[in-house]
Each structure stands twice: as structure tokens, then as C-alpha cells.
């Protein structure tokens, strides 16, 4: 109670209720401390340690996440944005968002709504594949061995269309992975 204030970082969004979030901001202003919210994933370590070059055109991107809806999909979305916002033209705004769950996710992949190739690339970077990778310490290809659909009981897919034409997909694959991975397909600058 010496009258000093320290900055506060609130992991994820401020609250699931707008009135609670407003109260948190109001208190930070009254008490005079800097207040920020967001995900810590955009600033955590990456394996491999990679940053997309600034101003590179991106064709599409796919993020794989794990965890319950709301807190963990927020982390996946912010981690994805930390990569794609470096693209040519930067952040231009969101045009539309669609979320689907269950078997519709696999059908959407089969129909080309999201890329199995990008999913394969993202899964190849996972340090925490589940199934026999975990129980028997065996490497596996979750897509080709048919285990992906067996391990993931209720997949969720978020597709985000941006105003500059970029389309991204975020797949929440509880049961298949224990970490967050991403794959980005660059567009030829010409």
C-alpha cells in the first residue's frame, strides 16, 4: 500500500462477460496501472524458431490447437495472427468467420474447404502427438494411418476470410495433439 502500481497482463481475453471486462478496465484506470490482455503464445518460443519475413504474400495458413473452446481457441487464433499479420499488406480486417464441429470438419477437408496438406505439415511439427506416439513412443502419420478421426472425438474448425483475400483455418484437434502447430503456404510474390 505504498501507492505504486505495476503493469498487469491478463492471459487471454478480459472476461467472458462484457460488464466484468468493463469493470476490470475501470479499476485499472482508477488505480493507475497499465493493463493488457491477450495470449502469451505469440511471444513464446517456437520450434523451429521461425518468423515469416515481413511483406511476404501468403496463400493460406492452418493452425492446429488443443483445448476447450473459448480459452484455448483464443490462444490458437492469436498465435496464428502473430504469423499472418506480417504478410504483405498486413492486417486488413476480417470479412467473415465460420465455425463447424464434428464430422462436418472432416467433410470440409475432403471438400477442399481447408488443406489436408497444410494439416499434414502442421502435424509434422508437433512434439506431442497422441495415440501410439505417446503410448508406445512410435512415430506415426495420423492422417494416413486413419488415427486422426479415431483420436479426435469432436473436432472444431474455424475458417477466417480476410478482406485482402487470405483464408485461414484453425483446427482444434483434442485427442490428437497436445500442443499448437501451424503451417503457412506462401504465395509467389509475382
Description of each model-found segment:
Residues 1-39:
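Beta-strand-loop-alpha-helix segment that lines the small-molecule cofactor/substrate pocket
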Amino acid at each position: 500500500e505504498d501507492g505504486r502500481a505495476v503493469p498487469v497482463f491478463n492471459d487471454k481475453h478480459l472476461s467472458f462477460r462484457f460488464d466484468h471486462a468493463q469493470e476490470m478496465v475501470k479499476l485499472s484506470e482508477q488505480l493507475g496501472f497499465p493493463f493488457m490482455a491477450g495470449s502469451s503464445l505469440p511471444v513464446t518460443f517456437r520450434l523451429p524458431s521461425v518468423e515469416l519475413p515481413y511483406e511476404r504474400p501468403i496463400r493460406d495458413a492452418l493452425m492446429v490447437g488443443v483445448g476447450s473452446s473459448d480459452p484455448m481457441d483464443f490462444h490458437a487464433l492469436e498465435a496464428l495472427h502473430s504469423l499472418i499479420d506480417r504478410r504483405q499488406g498486413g492486417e486488413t480486417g476480417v470479412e467473415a468467420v465460420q465455425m463447424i464441429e464434428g464430422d462436418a470438419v472432416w467433410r470440409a477437408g475432403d471438400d477442399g474447404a481447408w488443406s489436408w496438406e497444410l494439416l499434414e505439415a502442421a502435424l509434422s511439427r508437433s512434439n506431442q502427438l497422441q495415440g501410439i506416439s505417446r503410448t508406445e513412443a512410435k512415430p506415426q502419420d495420423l492422417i494416413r494411418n486413419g488415427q486422426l478421426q479415431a483420436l479426435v472425438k469432436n473436432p472444431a474448425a474455424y475458417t477466417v476470410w480476410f478482406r485482402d483475400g487470405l483464408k485461414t483455418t484453425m483446427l482444434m484437434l483434442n485427442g490428437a495433439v497436445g500442443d499448437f502447430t501451424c503451417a503457412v503456404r506462401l504465395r509467389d510474390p509475382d
